[in-house]
Amino acid sequence: MTKMLKRVLQDVLSEEENEQLISAFDQIGDIIIVRIPDSLISKKQIIGKTLLEQVSTANSVFYQSSPVEGDFRTRQLEVIAGENKTQTEYRENGCRFIVDVEKAFFSPRLSTERERIAGLVKDGEIVANMFGGVGMFSLLAAKDTACTVYNIDINPVAAQLCKENAQINKLKGEVISLNGDCLLYTSPSPRDKRQSRMPSSA
């Protein structure tokens, strides 16, 4: 969405300022998250207002003021336009997900990879999804496959959201949300598959 971001803001920023927009924005449900270079921090309110006006499906615009960091893989967000709420509903490949974009890790940019890996899971398999977050991969794997997925995350907010997401979706398989250190859960017993992608600090 980098080109779209530049196009949307071309009438409110100078050409030089527009060129400094080096990062795309993410839209998760009705929430937009944008990164703004230090040189344009003074323009963050007008950037947020313009995005809110131009993207009809958005109700909130947040500026990401820190990278993803810590054991819980969370980031600091500052509302710059619209509603100051960080929870929303996101849909992907036929599943509904309740996500909190500030309190639990989530990235819409991994959707293709999630779908690809979920397609490798077979009926009857047991899968340990380490760093499982709100259950994105886990629910996609169990949606049309009679498998059991243990979704493990050390972040209690992510674990609770995964539990809620498993309840609001119709699954052929089963997703079990576990809150804790994935190494403590997965070391003692074998699993047919382990999904252990650790998201980078985005």
Residue ranges and their predicted role:
Residues 196-202:
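Hydrophobic alpha-helical segments, chiefly the membrane-spanning helices
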Residues 118-181:
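Conserved SAM/SAH cofactor-binding pocket of Class I
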Residues 13-28, 42-109:
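Non-catalytic substrate-recognition/targeting regions of SAM-dependent transferases
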